[in-house]
Amino acid sequence: MDNEELTLFRDMTRRALEQEVAPHFEEWEQNHMVPRELWNTLGAAGLLCPDMPEEYGAAGTTPQVTFAIIEEASRMGFGGVATGYGIHSNIVAPYIKHFGTDEQKEHWLPKMVSGEAVGALAMTEPGAGSDVQGIRTNAVKDGDEWILNGSKIFITNGYHADLVIVAAI
């Protein structure tokens, strides 16, 4: 990706945030919630998971683009939007891309790219905080399924999540 393409993504991001986030941000902050519709809007603008492969409906760019989108949201003072975006596009989608089955990739990645599905991360625990070495939630294989035992708090994007990556031992 050259600097000109990256600049175009930055400009597109700024315009989308000015139009879709800025007019509502104060209200969202007071309510401690970003509306679900924002995910659909960002997906329609091609801003969600842009570095995922084109076969899933993404732009197939480099991770540099997702970092630039986070930078622009942060520069504009939209830290909560930047954090939720980062979890969705930079953590959950890559987990599915690298560790998911073909069936999971085909099911989830197009929906995450479009904003139809929102990804969340459940890592923080009451006794451990975000220290992954202190995690107590465990996962036990039971036939074809996994049983999770434990508690999570402060789940980023949890309110709207369709898919949650859970940190467990």
What are these regions (language model features)?
Residues 115-123, 167:
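A short, Trp-centered hydrophobic/proline-enriched beta-strand micro-motif
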Residues 145, 149-169:
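A short core secondary-structure module
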Residues 55, 123-128, 153-154:
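Short, solvent-exposed loop/turn elements at beta->coil junctions and helix N-caps
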Residues 1-86, 97, 103-107, 111-114, ...:
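Amphipathic, small/basic residue-rich leader segments at the start of a protein or domain
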Residues 108, 135, 151-153:
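Short beta-alpha junctions and helix-cap segments that line functional grooves
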Residues 61, 131-133, 157-162:
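Short glycine/proline-enriched turns and hinge-like loops at secondary-structure junctions
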Residues 88-93:
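Well-ordered alpha-helical segments within folded domains of soluble proteins
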Residues 131-149:
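Cytochrome P450 C-terminal beta-domain/meander region
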